Amino acid sequence: MRVLGLNQERGEVELVVEVLEDLYYLFLLVRKGDVVYGWTTRQLRIERATGEERGERIPVYLGVEVEKVSYAKFSEKLRFTGRVVEAPEEVYAKGSFHTIQVGVGDRVKIVKKSGIDGFTRNILEKAASKIRRVLLISVGDEEVAVGYLSPVGVEVRAVVGYSPVGRGKESSLDERYREPIASIVQRIFESGRAEHVDEVVVAVNERLAEVVSRVLGELGVKARVVKVSEGGEAGIYELLRGGQSRELLSSVRLPLELAEVERVLQELFSGKGKAVAGLENVEKVAEWGIVKTLIVSDALLFGEESRERVLKVLGEVFSRNGKIFIVPEESEAGRKLKPFGGALAELYYSLE
């Protein structure tokens, strides 16, 4: 989540949803009575002598006083429903009900009814710390492109051209391409571009895949190699068109969630009394202030009956700087969590 602005006096926060997990934090931020501003579509009403007619749907920027928050799993969007408090006059929307949908890549402004309190700041800090960066290197026959893959797209930083060494059938692919590619890749890492990234992904065409793998091994670079039909700058955009960017980004986070679930389950099975399972048990230890790590299924967070209970637990764990993981129910981590009531907590000390 990227926070674009924070106005303490007005209780305003403006942000961009960067990853799917940010929707969980946004869900925690917005309460009934808060006003959410965002882009949506609204049908025009046209007054004629014969009466009122419905016109086309147009994009408009609206403010909605939230009465209900829901999550649409199919579209992976949060839905904020309530009365419109601010809208362009031409759409005649003020006072009527409307739903603003927010998904990955969307920009939204929230005006908190109760102001920017410590709980809100804590959520924003933790959400901002979840940003993951992927360094993307795309190797083509005549150029190497370098960029950063983010949840809302790709930022190409440089495109470096090169010429293969030697010519003719007597020269192997390795002899012609290994040295120039190795030189460029080495410069990328020496320049510091790989610092503060969570993963390095190298895109390369089928023809040069073996050469590039050998280069990475010789340079000691740990990277995931993804095959594309064409490398270079075109290869980067091929990744985006093919929908692989989402997989690359989610893979940075999901193994961590799975590892945490397995680790806390192991602690639970050890019988040492330093872990509990099930929402009811988690509520108790959260109230006592002894939760070190909390893992909750998104099914509990978005559930009508369990939402308020989960929000209370999250608030208690947030306030004591505990680690929190919210996992999708359909993920491998979520499936392992389900038999234990969708909630696990690792404790600072044993209950035995």
From Swiss-Prot:
Its EC number is 3.1.-.-. It is an enzyme of class 3 (hydrolase). It is found in: Cytoplasm. The keyword Cell membrane does not apply. GO terms for cellular component: cytoplasm. GO terms for biological process: nonfunctional rRNA decay; nuclear-transcribed mRNA catabolic process, no-go decay; nuclear-transcribed mRNA catabolic process, non-stop decay; ribosome disassembly; RNA surveillance. GO terms for molecular function: endonuclease activity; metal ion binding. It comes from the Archaea. Its cofactor is a divalent metal cation. Monomer. Belongs to the eukaryotic release factor 1 family. Pelota subfamily. PANTHER family: PELOTA (PTHR10853), PROTEIN PELOTA HOMOLOG (PTHR10853:SF0). May function in recognizing stalled ribosomes, interact with stem-loop structures in stalled mRNA molecules, and effect endonucleolytic cleavage of the mRNA. May play a role in the release non-functional ribosomes and degradation of damaged mRNAs. Has endoribonuclease activity. The N-terminal domain has the RNA-binding Sm fold. It harbors the endoribonuclease activity. This is Protein pelota homolog. It comes from Thermofilum pendens (strain DSM 2475 / Hrk 5). The gene is pelA.
